[in-house]
């Protein structure tokens, strides 16, 4: 019982402006819209939780990952704990994200399929190496590509067509505050018609 809709777009980022004042005016208007959406969603009794992001469907393995000499393709998601709760993603072992986690880090959670595929027995000793960087951030050495520490394992869930089986999945941390992504909201029990 999750709905999704697009409220905002990249308009202010992709548009050309005549001057800085015009750009600032548009930016301020966009920030105001974000605040209004937040206030309305937080106050609405129709929803249990809400956030921004893409639904975890149609995830295809596209990132080359290596561990102990084995290479496989994995699907990648960038999410926070609110997103995991909204979609009912269940932790099997290890931990989910905490206050110390940030976007620019080399930690990931994986699903059971990835664990089996890479034959990981002890996640405390597991690391996965991506073929290329998955993120860029100011102040990081972009010539390096360290391996990712596995901090948790989640239960498998379908990310695509039922006949395709479970895709190996890596979950990286994201604050989930990008209002240009679709807004998703989990409906409160018995509120489907009202929503």
Predicted regions: what is each one?
Residues 62-70, 126-128, 164-169:
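Short, surface-exposed loop/helix-turn segments at secondary-structure junctions
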Residues 3-5, 108, 128, 170-171, ...:
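Well-ordered beta-strand positions enriched in small/hydrophobic/aromatic, beta-favoring residues
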Residues 27-49, 112-119, 132-195:
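"Rare, low-scoring activations can occur
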Residues 106, 126, 148:
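Nucleotide donor/acceptor-binding cores
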Residues 1-109, 113-116:
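Structured, solvent-exposed hinge/loop segments at the ends of secondary-structure elements
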Residues 93, 122-126:
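PAS and related sensory helical modules
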């Amino acid at each position: 019982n999750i709905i999704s809709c697009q409220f905002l777009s990249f308009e202010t980022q992709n548009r050309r402006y005549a001057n800085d004042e015009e750009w600032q005016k548009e930016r301020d208007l966009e920030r105001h819209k974000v605040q209004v959406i937040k206030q309305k969603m937080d106050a609405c009794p129709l929803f249990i939780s809400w956030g921004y992001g893409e639904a975890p469907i149609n995830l295809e393995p596209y990132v080359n990952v290596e561990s102990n000499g084995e290479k496989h393709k994995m699907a990648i998601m960038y999410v926070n704990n609110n997103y995991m709760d909204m979609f009912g993603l269940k932790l099997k072992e290890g931990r989910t994200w905490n206050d110390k986690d940030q976007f620019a880090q080399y930690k990931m959670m994986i699903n059971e399929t990835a664990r089996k595929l890479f034959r990981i027995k002890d996640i405390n000793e597991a690391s996965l190496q991506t073929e290329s960087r998955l993120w860029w951030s100011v102040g990081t050495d972009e010539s390096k590509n360290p391996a990712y520490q596995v901090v948790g394992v989640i239960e498998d869930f379908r990310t695509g067509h039922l006949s395709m089986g479970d895709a190996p999945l890596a979950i990286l941390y994201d604050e989930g505050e990008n209002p240009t992504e679709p807004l998703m909201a989990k409906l409160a029990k018995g509120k489907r018609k009202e929503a």
